[in-house]
């Protein structure tokens, strides 16, 4: 969702060339057709590849030498990653390292990682892997001349697998609409708004920053369900039941934008702040990452312990 919108907004700026790399051919085909329909003169190249394939990734960077890289590829579904935690490490952590390294090795000017507020004091493996990705970006910024930054934000409205399409489907099917906890809250932003801010944050980059987007006031998910039922012309808990199902493994009642050690610096845009980066020991990080990959690929129980060593604020959910 974010990747597609990035392509839409970048294509309007008439880039010298826009290269889309995706592992899913159907998604890639859909956005390719949409972009060319709207802008037939766009110099667009669509490549099918996995971020886990370091040779393929390096070959792409060596051949096309992109100047600006937006890295949005990630497994993002919290409960699914709790049951497949090793896949979160292989795709999110290993994939980010391989793409970030290829960018630096091949002289990219700027690398922007799409991160999440779930990286802050994570209670789930998805958030913990995204925090490690932020650490990788900070370490890479010291290793190469490329300016590496991360942009951290919350949920986007209507994205694949998000709550609004789910509620809409549940209402269409006659209910119940399922909410995990009556008091659970989340930050929301529209996809175009989030991407517009990501592009602006990328323009502010000097290297090593974690940009934090102002998502406004948090929304209570129960209220969202209640209002969506009313907007459908139905009465909540009469025509359509709102069912409380209990927090899922790795799920928090609320998300945080910053860790305790981080402070906020303002930018020219009041919607974008810079989180004061926590220092990263690059040697320790890269050594631990090697151990982590071995455990993830061997699917051992030790993998989560290594994630906790890298991200001490990660609280392992014993239910998952």
Predicted regions and their residues:
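Hydrophobic/small residue at the entry helix of a nucleotide-binding pocket
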Residues: 2
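Helix N-cap at the beta1-alpha1 junction of Rossmann-like dinucleotide-binding domains, i.e.
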Residues: 24-27
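Strand-loop microenvironment adjacent to phosphate/nucleotide-handling motifs in alpha/beta enzyme folds
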Residues: 135-156, 160-320
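Proline-aspartate-enriched helix->loop->beta-strand connector
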Residues: 15-16, 61, 65-70, 78, ...
């Amino acid at each position: 969702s974010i990747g597609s919108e990035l392509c839409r907004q970048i294509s309007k700026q008439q880039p010298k060339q826009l290269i889309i790399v995706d592992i899913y051919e159907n998604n890639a085909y859909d956005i390719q057709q949409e972009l060319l329909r709207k802008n037939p003169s766009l110099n667009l190249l669509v490549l099918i590849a996995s971020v886990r394939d370091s040779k393929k990734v390096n070959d792409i960077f060596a051949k096309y030498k992109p100047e600006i890289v937006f890295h949005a590829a990630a497994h993002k579904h919290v409960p699914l990653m709790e049951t497949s935690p090793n896949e979160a490490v292989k795709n999110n952590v290993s994939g980010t390292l391989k793409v970030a390294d290829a960018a630096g090795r091949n002289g990219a000017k700027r690398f922007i990682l799409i991160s999440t507020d779930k990286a802050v004091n994570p209670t789930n493996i998805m958030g913990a892997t995204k925090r490690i990705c932020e650490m990788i970006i900070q370490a890479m910024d010291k290793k190469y001349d490329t300016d590496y930054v991360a942009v951290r934000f919350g949920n986007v409205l209507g994205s694949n697998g998000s709550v609004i399409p789910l509620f809409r489907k549940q209402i269409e099917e006659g209910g119940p609409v399922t909410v995990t906890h009556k008091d659970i809250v989340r930050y929301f932003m529209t996809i175009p708004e989030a991407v517009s801010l990501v592009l602006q944050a990328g323009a502010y980059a000097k290297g090593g920053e974690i940009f934090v987007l102002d998502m406004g006031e948090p929304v209570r998910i129960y209220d969202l369900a209640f209002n969506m039922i009313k907007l459908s012309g139905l009465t909540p808990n009469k025509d359509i039941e709102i069912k409380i199902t209990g927090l899922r493994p790795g799920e928090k009642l609320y998300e945080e934008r910053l860790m305790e050690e981080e402070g906020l610096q303002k930018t020219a845009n009041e919607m974008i702040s810079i989180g004061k980066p926590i220092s990263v020991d690059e040697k320790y990080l890269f050594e631990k990452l090697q151990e982590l990959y071995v455990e993830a690929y061997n699917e051992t129980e030790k993998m989560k312990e290594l994630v906790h060593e890298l991200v001490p604020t990660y609280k392992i959910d014993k239910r998952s």
